[in-house]
């Protein structure tokens, strides 16, 4: 009887446990899903679920899963780079505890709202950024048949890349007409592109290492310190996103006279857990010398370039991320007399350089406080070593003996280090209902340049140190009104006092299609040698060199800009425009004062002038029909003048206008993609008339003068056809085209060894035929 009673109690207990535990066992469910686009899985899509604020990434098959979800209503948001985000509401209940759903992503008709970082040092949508940020993707660089960064930046509004030496072809970037030393080049957001590296660096960075390039015009010293007066160009290298590879070969024939071979490849591996990945790029280039005027001296130098690098990420734990990249650029460059049978220092005129450049950077980011706060620690380093020769073989027998006993070979070494911390915090309901993202940071930048040619008594030994502290407030006053303000304080070893660089910018969004912006910013340039100052040119039958005035002080700037951005989407069509007015005032502006001759050639001294003004208008127009026809263009009208006339050549009347700066320039790009197999690109670059100094010395140039050179229209096109190899899961693409169809190239060059090597302008190369093949993983 007692045992029966115990058994009855046990059965009752088990029954009660089953009854009360039923809702507990079944009060949780799961959501699984599949993300695709045009029948293809989209891996590494970010899947967010609200209100629990949990994020996962889709796997290599496009699938994701949320486990152990309490019954309730959830909002799922899917976002992926290159696709329009989508949102859906899903209910998990006792009736349907396990939900399986499919999401189809679509590519936007036109990329108008990329996520950018350069304008504020925080990630924001372009339409939400107080500062206009233009984006040039790695894919667009390849469609434009750009071999390097220098060729791609021509297709950005307000930007010009010019070749400034007939012998070595060094380049500089002009933003709103300001010379290269006024622009800050960043690699993954870090200012390690040193002045000496900048001489040839834009040509040494291959396009296949690049994820995208972000461009901010106007003063940026409040975030990036010295030299960001004209603007900032941020080169972002490829990060691994999925397992993939691509191999590309291109052959170029320059005006039926010289060959150019380019081979590059990319290989990417990502772990199954998607917590680590590595991307490798390789590039090789061999270009022959090119002589345009048949004087046996080159207009395009020989190039022998090899580069490689890796970019990687690792997620050691939740909300922690480590990014690391390292690359090596190795280049041999020779221009001058086209003789191969004698050593370099026996040739009539020659510039020979061998560069070995290492660049590395590392970022560690921690997100905390429910993702309202983040801390970023970063370190970046660059080292360039260079062997070089710059010389003219003399005519006089006594000078020949001196030349041969001590030929003008030289050595250069540059090291740049950057270390810093950045803290971001998002304040909710800050004073008004809006949010405010506060950014505070500090960084240290060290740059050491040694450049010497003993034969010329030329010795540059420059070390700069800069400690910067910056504070920024990104305040959403109202849903359609945003105020961005901030200030940076720099302590520079070449400047006696602290440099304060404030900025403020107002963004007003008129509905969803229009953004109005008004910005003010200040900047400075330290009294140091920049890229063009470190270039020894040929002029007047000798060489020319630049020295710094002992009284040189920092240059200051104030910049204003106002813009209207409008984009109107329709069912299958979108069109838009951007109109911007800009004005920059320079105080104590740098200029080169002719300073006579010595036994080696011309001398110039860098001095401070009284002031200068840069102002103008930039207009952009864009449209896209159903992702099959896309048009983009930009045109700039500007006026750049010194306050007082500047003497560029001794004995030639001074002028106020900036040299080598046209008042009108622009570009246009038309891309046709009628189907997934065929593609066509037609692009155009216009360069207006400008003033270029021309020194005497060559046999065909007997007077010093400033020349108002002709305008140029550079038209190019590219055709491509792709074929899918389904068994191998590969795509093979053939492409061909012509650069500079109209052969719009400088038609008058100096002749012989005593030429003025800086008298070069217009398009970088004459008509060039190209063709190639690309093999990559994936599906059409």
Segments from the language model and where they lie:
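Extracytoplasmic beta-strand/coil segments of soluble accessory domains associated
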Residues: 133, 150-191, 211
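Short acidic/polar hinge/loop motifs at secondary-structure boundaries
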Residues: 172-174, 190-217, 238, 265
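Outer-membrane beta-barrel translocator/receptor signature
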Residues: 194-196, 209-211, 222-293, 301-308, ...
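Flexible loop and strand-edge segments within Gram-negative outer membrane beta-barrel domains
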Residues: 287-307, 313-375, 382-415
